[in-house]
Amino acid sequence: MNPPGSLAGLDPNLDEHLSTQILAPSVHSDNPQERIQARRLRIAARLEPRRREALGEYLDGKKESEEDQSKSYKQKEESRLKLAKLLLCGTELVTNIQVAIDIREIHRRVEEEEIKRQRIEKLENEVKTSQDKFDEITSKWEEGKQKRIPQELWEMLNTQQLHCAGLLEDKNKLISELQQELKTKDDQYVKDLKKQSDDICLLLERMEEQVKNVMKTFREELYNIEKAFEVERQELLASNKKKWERALQAHNAKELEYLTNRMKKVEDYEKQLNRQRIWDCEEYNTIKIKLEQDVQILEQQLQQRKAIYQLNQEKLEYNLQVLKKRDEESTVIKSQQKRKINRLHDILNNLRSKYAKQIKQFQEENQSLTLDYKRLVLQFKELQKAMRHFALIDDEKFREIWLMNEEEAKDLIARAFDVDRIIHTHHLGLPWTAPDFWFLKNVGPISQQPQKSATQIVEEMLMHTEEEEAEEAASEPESYLDLPKQVSEKTTKKILMLLCDESGFLIESKLLSLLLPLEQNECYLLRLDAIFSALGIESEDDLYKLVNFFLKYRAHRLSSSLQIKSCSQASMEKASMEETSMGSELELAEQTEMEGAKEESLVEGEKEEEEETPPSPWDIHPNDVLKILEAFVMGLKKPRDSRAPPRVQKNMRNNSKDSEYWQALTTVIPSSKQNLWDALYTALEKYHIVLTQRAKLLLENSSLEQRNTELQALLQQYLNSKINSELQVPPTQVLRVPTK
C-alpha cells in the first residue's frame, strides 16, 4: 500500500513506468478485469481466422512483416501502450487512498471489538462482585433480626451503611469510567470525520491531477501520431513521384518504337489486305450464314446451361448451409442433453428427500387442517350472518341509487318532451299530446316487493277482520288470505289468539301492566309482537310456517290418537298434565325429541300435503300449545342454521326486467320522431344560413347607400362651384345630374 500523497512524487518515475512493457492479460490472474480481458482476446483470436476465410484472406498471406510495418503503426502502438500504462498507474494512485482507508477501518473495528470484549468482561466481573456484596449485606440483615442488644444493632447498622456506601461508590466509579469512555469515543468520532474530509480532498486533488496528466499525454501522443502520419505521407509522395517519372520515360520510348514498327506493318498489311479482301468476301458470306445458325443454337444451349448451373449452385449452397446448421444444432443438443441428465439426477435426489419430508409434513398438516376445518365452519356461520346483514344494507343502497338514476332519467325525459312540444307547437304548428308509457309511472326497482314482517301481517289481519266482521254471514264460506295451503284468515286469527292467551309467560310483567288500558286489538297486537320477538319469528314466511305447523301437528296427533282407546287417552292426558306440573326433565326431553322428529317429518312432507284440507283450530287443546311451540322452535332453529344461504338466495330480487326498463327509458323518443328532428335541424340550419346572408347583404346595401349619398354631395358641390361658370364648356352641359 502506497502512503497517501500528491502526484509530485510520481512525476520523476512516470517515464520509467511508461517505458516498461505491459504483459499480456492472463486467465489465471487474481484481477477479475484482467481475466475478462484475457477471455475476450482468446475469443477474438479464435474468430479471426473465420473472418479472414469469409473475406478471402489467408493467415499465411500477410503482405507486411513486423520489420516492414509503417512508422504510423509503430507510433500508434507506442502511444497505446504509453496511455494504457498511464491510466493503470493513475488508477492505482487514486485507489491507494481507498485501500488505506479500508485498512484503517479494519484496524479500528478490531480494536473496537477488543475494547468491547474487555468492557463486557469488566461489567460481568462488576456484576458478580456487586451481587456478592449485596448477598453479604442481605445475609447480615437476617442476623440483625436475631440480635436484641441496641449497641450491637447500632454497630451492625453502621457496618451495613459502610458496605452499602462502598457498593454505591463502586457503581458510581464504573458509571464515571463509562461516561469518560463515551466522551473519548465522541472525540474520536470528530477526528475520524475530519480525517475522512481530508482524505476526500486528497482524492479529489489526485483525480484532478490525473485528469490533467491524461489530457496532456493524450494531446502529446495525438500530435506525435499526426506527425508520424504526415512524415509517412511526404515519403510516400516522393517515392511515388519518382516511380511515376521513370514509368513515363519508359512509356514514351516504347510508344516511339511501336510507332515505327506499326508504319512498316501497315504497308505490308495493305498489300495483303487487297489480296485477301476478294477471297474473304466470298468466304465471309458462306461462313456468316453458317455461323449465325451455330450462334443461335449455342446461345440457346448457353442459356440452358446457365439456368442449370444457377439452379445447381443454389441447391449446393442451400444444402451446405443446412448441413452446417444441423451440425451446430447437433452439438448444442448434445451438450444440452448432458446438462439436462445431470440436472435431472439432482432433481430426482431432491425429490426423494422432499417426498420423505412431505409425508411427515402432510400428516402434521392433516391434523392442523382438521382443527382449521372446525374453526372455519364456525367462521362460515358467522359470515352467513354478516352476509344477511350486508345484503339488507346493499338492497337499501341499491334502491337509493336506483331512485337517483331514475329521477335523473325522468328529468331528461321531461326536457325531451318539452323540446318535442316546442317543436310541434311553435315550429311545425301541430297539436302535441304527451305520451303515456308504463315505465314513466314506475318508482323504485322493478319486481321488488319488500317482505312484510310478522307484526305487519297480524296488524293487517286484525284490521281486516274488524271491518268485515259485521258483513260476514254464517252460511258464507270463510275468506282466505294469501297464505300457503289456503289457510283462511279466521283460522289464522284463532290460532294467534290461542297462542297469545297461552304464551303470556314470554311477555315481561312491565309490558303486561302497560297493555291493560289499551283496546283489545292493540293489546293483542303488542302481545303477539313480544311473543314473536321471543320465539325468533321475524318475517312473513316464519308466521306462515307457525300457522301451518299448528294445523299439521294437530292433524298428526288426531291420526295417531284414533288407534288408542278412550281410557288410555284419558290416562295419558292426566299423566301429561301431572308431568307438566312436576316439570320432569327426562320425560320432557324425550317428548321434545319426538316432537322435533315429527316437526321434521312435517316440514319434509309439505309438498306432499299441499292438497290436503287443514283441520279446524278448535280441535287444538290449550295444553298442547306449549308442546307445539317447543317443537316448532327446535325445528325452526335447525333449518335456519343449515339453510342460511338458500334464505339469502330467496330474498334476492329478480333483475330480469331491469335492462328492459332502462332500455325503454332510452326509447321514449322514437326513431321516426328523431328523423323528424334531424330534418327540422337541417332545415333550420339552412334557414339560419339564408338569414345570415341576408344580414350581410343588408349591411353591404346600407354601406353602398351611404357612399352614394357622399358621392352625390361631392358632385353637387363640384357643380355648384364658381369656377365652372368661367369654363368654355361647363360640366353642367355635359353631365346630367339627377335631382333628389
From Swiss-Prot:
Q: Any signal peptide, and if so, which residues?
A: none
Which spans of this chain does the record mark as coiled coil?
A: 101-387, 691-724
State whether keyword Ubl conjugation applies.
no
The record's annotation in InterPro entries points to: DRC1/2_N, DRC1/DRC2, DRC1_C
Keyword annotations for this protein, in alphabetical order, are: Cell projection, Cilium, Coiled coil, Cytoplasm, Cytoskeleton, Flagellum
The keyword Coiled coil is annotated on this UniProt entry? yes
Q: Spell out the residue ranges making up region: Disordered.
A: 56-75, 573-620
Record's subcellular location: Cytoplasm, Cytoskeleton, Cilium axoneme; Cytoplasm, Cytoskeleton, Flagellum axoneme
What are the record's GO terms for cellular component? axonemal dynein complex; axoneme; motile cilium
Biological process per Gene Ontology, one example term: cilium-dependent cell motility
Q: Which domain of life is it from?
A: Eukaryota
Bias type Basic and acidic residues, positions: 595-605
- What quaternary structure, including any partners, is listed in this protein's UniProt entry? Component of the nexin-dynein regulatory complex (N-DRC). Interacts with CCDC65/DRC2, DRC3, GAS8/DRC4 and TCTE1/DRC5.
Q: What does this protein do?
A: Component of the nexin-dynein regulatory complex (N-DRC) a key regulator of ciliary/flagellar motility which maintains the alignment and integrity of the distal axoneme and regulates microtubule sliding in motile axonemes. Plays a critical role in the assembly of N-DRC and also stabilizes the assembly of multiple inner dynein arms and radial spokes. Coassembles with CCDC65/DRC2 to form a central scaffold needed for assembly of the N-DRC and its attachment to the outer doublet microtubules.
Q: What family does the database annotate?
A: Belongs to the DRC1 family.
Q: What is this protein called?
A: Dynein regulatory complex protein 1
The organism named in the record is Macaca fascicularis
